């Protein structure tokens, strides 16, 4: 394995691919809800339903993508195929401006590509290191930070291109980014020769009437068509129900097979953390839907004579995550003293509290809009930044707990279940919540008048809902704190 003095050379090609994948995914995501409502003239109900269905299914398909990589394709081929599908999907999405029937197919292709890419790029990175290599953690941190760079730049670049040229050009820029990442990755192909490749024996093995490579081709053709039908008929919720039922059944099986009380206790903790994470992300994912439309309709986006494109506001969250994450890493050191469970609940309370504070600021912004016609941009930026800061106290804490569990062979499964619930189900619930803002009336000329009161109500309800979650978490935190203190007093 060729290395520099610090990291394997191959990591820089993986990091480049990750930057451009984030650029592609978040650039398109920043435009999607605005494209549906402003260009295709979907009503808010339809737009929210399709947006939440798309954001939900991108968290379901990585389960199948991981299986295909493990059994047939290998991580490297799965990542390349996924990147290619996402690029094609973004190009087809641009064509839907003149042929709306392409909309569902394009989103389905992106979902399939994301499934092959997302679950396997981290596994490919892991293949670059020996199990005990001390550089491993640094490599994953580098990839995560690089991804945030892509998600910061993407809404700015794609939003600007869309505003100055066209929607098709905005989506094409996302596709170009993904192609650029794939080309860079292919240029470093010689550095990945030691990683697992395609399982030729398994691909050529016959099953039923066809070899496995034939069934793989059938899957690559039919899966996008099937998912497109789910989008078209708004049947995505049924796929989520099936996936959730399977995930919960697997979780119950793991719990029943746990051998010690400590293992069962850790599993119960993970389940409760996942429940609060689900609620947190149902609130946080308003950023791409209801909050985006609120900014577009009710926020003064002018800086002198220039009007800031709505999509650019999607960069604030990612920027806050990266900046605050670096500050926290520098200022805060994990204490080895005290009870870890107590610390976990303290962090969750802080994360949910910050989410409540962020939506409180948005509620003030909406009330300002109701009083003066439009709200100020700095108030909006502050609210989004606080919400981004909140993320640092939820997912990293929950994922850390999952990786610590002392049950062999279940970490990957539990991670998948966590992503299913806090990703797919949370995005579906986010769509249900966002739909409450879709109240509108029509004036005499037939123009739509959107209700600012609906946004005030929803933002206020989320503020109080997140605050209620904080109250419950603080009760749990207090219970564990008193339990630890009682135990210490008994020992003394």
UniProtKB/Swiss-Prot annotation:
Residue runs in coiled coils: none
Assigned keywords, A-Z: Cell inner membrane, Cell membrane, Membrane, Peptide transport, Protein transport, Transmembrane, Transmembrane helix, Transport
GO MF: dipeptide transmembrane transporter activity; peptide:proton symporter activity
Compartment(s): Cell inner membrane
Domain of life per record: Bacteria
Primary location: membrane
GO BP of this protein: protein transport
GO CC term, one of those recorded: plasma membrane
Membrane topology value: Multi-pass membrane protein
Keyword Membrane: yes
Entry keyword annotation includes Metal-binding: no
Transmembrane segments: 14-34, 49-69, 91-111, 138-158, 167-187, 212-232, 236-256, 269-289, 312-332, 344-364, 379-399, 413-433, 458-478
Cross-referenced SUPFAM superfamilies: MFS general substrate transporter
Stated family: Belongs to the major facilitator superfamily. Proton-dependent oligopeptide transporter (POT/PTR) (TC 2.A.17) family. DtpD subfamily.
Known function: Probable proton-dependent permease that transports dipeptides.
Name of the molecule in the record: Dipeptide permease D
């Amino acid at each position: 394995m060729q290395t520099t003095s610090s990291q394997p050379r191959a990591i820089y090609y993986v990091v480049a691919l990750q930057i451009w994948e984030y650029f592609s995914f978040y650039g398109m995501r920043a435009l999607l809800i605005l494209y549906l409502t402003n260009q295709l003239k979907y009503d808010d109900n339809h737009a929210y339903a399709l947006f939440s269905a798309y954001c939900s299914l991108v968290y379901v398909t990585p389960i199948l993508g991981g299986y295909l990589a493990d059994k047939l394709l290998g991580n490297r081929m799965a990542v390349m195929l996924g990147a290619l599908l996402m690029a094609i999907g973004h190009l087809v999405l641009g064509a839907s401006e003149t042929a709306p029937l392409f909309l569902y197919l394009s989103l389905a292709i992106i979902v399939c590509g994301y499934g092959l890419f997302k679950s396997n790029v981290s596994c490919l990175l892991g293949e670059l290191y020996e199990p005990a290599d001390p550089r491993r953690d640094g490599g994953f941190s580098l990839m995560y930070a690089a991804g945030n760079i892509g998600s910061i730049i993407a809404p700015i670049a794609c939003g600007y291109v869309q505003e100055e040229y066209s929607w098709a050009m905005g989506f094409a820029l996302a596709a170009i980014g993904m192609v650029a990442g794939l080309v860079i990755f292919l240029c470093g192909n010689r550095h990945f020769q030691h990683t697992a490749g395609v399982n030729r024996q398994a691909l050529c093995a016959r099953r039923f009437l066809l070899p496995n490579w034939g069934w793989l081709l059938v899957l690559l053709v039919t899966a996008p068509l099937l998912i497109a039908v789910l989008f078209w008929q708004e049947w995505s919720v049924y796929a989520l129900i099936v996936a959730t039922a399977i995930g919960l059944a697997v979780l119950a099986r793991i719990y029943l097979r746990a051998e010690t009380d400590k293992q069962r206790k850790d599993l119960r903790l993970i389940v409760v953390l996942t429940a609060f994470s689900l609620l947190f992300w149902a609130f946080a994912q308003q950023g791409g839907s209801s909050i985006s439309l609120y900014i577009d309709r009710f926020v003064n986006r002018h800086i002198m004579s220039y009007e800031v494109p709505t999509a650019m506001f999607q960069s604030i969250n990612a920027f806050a995550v990266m900046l605050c994450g670096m500050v926290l890493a520098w200022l805060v050191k994990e204490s080895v003293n005290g009870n870890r469970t107590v610390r976990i609940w303290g962090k969750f309370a802080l994360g949910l509290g910050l989410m409540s504070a962020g939506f409180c600021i948005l509620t003030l912004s909406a009330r300002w809009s109701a009083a003066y016609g439009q709200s100020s941009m700095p108030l909006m930026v502050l609210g989004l930044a606080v919400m981004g800061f909140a993320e640092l106290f939820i997912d990293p804490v929950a994922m850390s707990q999952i990786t610590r569990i002392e049950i062999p062979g279940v970490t990957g499964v539990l991670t998948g279940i966590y992503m299913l619930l806090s990703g797919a189900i949370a995005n579906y619930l986010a769509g249900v919540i966002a739909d409450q803002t879709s109240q509108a009336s029509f004036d005499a000329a037939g123009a739509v008048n959107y209700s600012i009161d609906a946004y005030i109500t929803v933002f206020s309800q989320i503020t109080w809902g997140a605050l209620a979650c904080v109250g419950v978490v603080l009760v749990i935190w207090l219970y564990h704190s008193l339990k630890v203190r009682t135990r210490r007093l008994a020992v003394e």
